[in-house]
Swiss-Prot record:
Active site positions: 178 (cysteine persulfide intermediate)
Species per Swiss-Prot/TrEMBL record: Rickettsia peacockii (strain Rustic)
Family the entry assigns: Belongs to the TrhO family.
InterPro entries: Rhodanese-like_dom (IPR001763), Rhodanese-like_dom_sf (IPR036873), TrhO (IPR020936), TRHO_N (IPR040503)
PANTHER family: RHODANESE-LIKE DOMAIN-CONTAINING PROTEIN 7-RELATED, THIOSULFATE SULFURTRANSFERASE/RHODANESE-LIKE DOMAIN-CONTAINING PROTEIN 2
Protein's name in the database: tRNA uridine(34) hydroxylase
Length: 247
């Protein structure tokens, strides 16, 4: 019986002084371990999704952690019958998720995590507003019932939406949500940097929430857009064909 391919997704906001120096080291171990996928490196941290045997993807993750020294690392592993990636790429970027805001220190300055098991109770409180930080075509497929859709085409538009909606956010506990956690985590840092104190985000994002809770209270409506060959998943994480989403 053939071994399943492990697909490891990970990110961490951690200060990396010379991220370019890590590229040859990660390429070396990745190629030796037959890893495919992409790892993005920046001064603000790392963001990667790569595939291989379970043992080998974890060896690459261990090397990445050893080289960067993060306090918190977000990791999720799924499985597939085939590699979803063609080759290994390790790239240097200005940001690991592009927002185009300078001088954000997400590692030290971000909101509080809300665990998936506590999310439903938290977002149904009167003084909490939920903001879906994903792009409009993702929100269109599915979102939380109470979530505000900023109607952004790219994540780079989100800071402008925040500036234009100060009154909406004033005096509220703000709960951020996104697919896997990285965009909502960076969004909380943006809000903290401009003076909002009570800012929160869903740990592990929508996918972790659906896996952990099975949407038992039906606060999630629709499907969840994902950036791979599945295109969208239902609330039990079953894949859905969505050819019209390829835009």
């Amino acid at each position: 019986m053939n071994e399943k391919i492990a697909i490891l997704s990970t990110y961490s906001f951690v200060n990396i002084e010379e991220p370019a120096n890590l590229i040859p080291k990660l390429l070396l171990i990745g190629k030796r371990k037959y890893i495919r996928g992409t790892i993005l490196l920046a001064n603000e941290g790392f963001n990667g999704s790569f595939s291989g045997s379970y043992e080998n993807v974890n060896l690459v993750l261990e090397e990445l952690i050893k080289l960067t020294g993060p306090k918190d690392v977000n990791v999720k592993i799924n499985y597939s019958d085939v590699h979803p990636f063609q080759k290994l790429k390790v790239r240097l970027k200005k940001e690991i998720v592009a927002m185009n805001v300078d001088d954000l220190n997400v590692d030290l300055f971000k909101g509080e995590y809300i665990e998936p098991k506590d999310w439903d109770e938290f977002i149904t409180k009167q003084d909490v507003i939920v903001i879906d930080t994903r792009n409009d075509y993702e929100v269109e497929v599915g979102t939380f019932k109470s979530a505000i859709n900023p109607n952004t085409k790219t994540f780079k538009q989100f800071p402008a939406w925040v500036q234009q909606n100060q009154e909406l956010l004033k005096g509220k506990k703000i709960a951020m949500v996104c697919t896997g956690g990285i965009r909502c985590e960076k969004s909380t840092s943006l809000l903290k940097s401009i003076g909002y104190d009570e800012v929160y985000h869903l740990k592990g994002g929508i996918l972790q929430y659906l896996e952990d809770t099975q949407n038992k209270n039906n606060l999630w409506q629709g499907e969840c857009f994902v950036f791979d060959d599945r295109r969208a998943v239902t609330d039990d994480l079953s894949p859905v064909e969505r050819h019209w989403l390829q835009r």
